[in-house]
Amino acid sequence: MIGNWNYGTGRRKSAVARVFIKSGKGDIVVNGKPIKEYFARETSLMIVRQPLELTEHAETFDIKVNVTGGGETGQAGAVRHGITRALIDYDATLKSALSKAGYVTRDAREVERKKVGFHKARRRKQFSKR
């Protein structure tokens, strides 16, 4: 807890989100913009709101987010992870419901590196018999 703000760090792919929540009327601001302006896709908005809707705190908190790196999907996942951690910082009894839904666990899937002699991570060069 920092002042009257609860804090959580979220990560997904190469995106990192720093999330601050405090009691309010449900405003979510991402990098200085309203959430609907920052995330264009409806699925990204849905991903970000999932932990709030699960715990029935959608209209209870004002949320301020700083997110860097990655694309839209990675950033949305990072914000969701950060909101989950901030909610647990606010009220530890929410952890069981959030972990049952799978929001507490960091999604460890990362981009696989390109290997030498391959076109991409797994795509090999075309084989010629003759």
Swiss-Prot record:
Coiled coil: none annotated. One of its GO terms (molecular function) is RNA binding. The keyword Secreted does not apply. InterPro entries: Ribosomal_Su5_D2-typ_SF, Ribosomal_uS9, Ribosomal_uS9_bac/plastid, Ribosomal_uS9_CS, Ribsml_uS5_D2-typ_fold_subgr. Signal peptide: none annotated. GO terms for cellular component: cytosolic small ribosomal subunit. Gene3D superfamilies: 3.30.230.10. GO terms for biological process: translation. Keywords: Ribonucleoprotein, Ribosomal protein. It comes from the Bacteria. The keyword Ribonucleoprotein applies. Pfam families: Ribosomal_S9. Belongs to the universal ribosomal protein uS9 family. This is Small ribosomal subunit protein uS9. It comes from Cupriavidus pinatubonensis (strain JMP 134 / LMG 1197) (Cupriavidus necator (strain JMP 134)). The lineage of its organism: Bacteria, Pseudomonadati, Pseudomonadota, Betaproteobacteria, Burkholderiales.
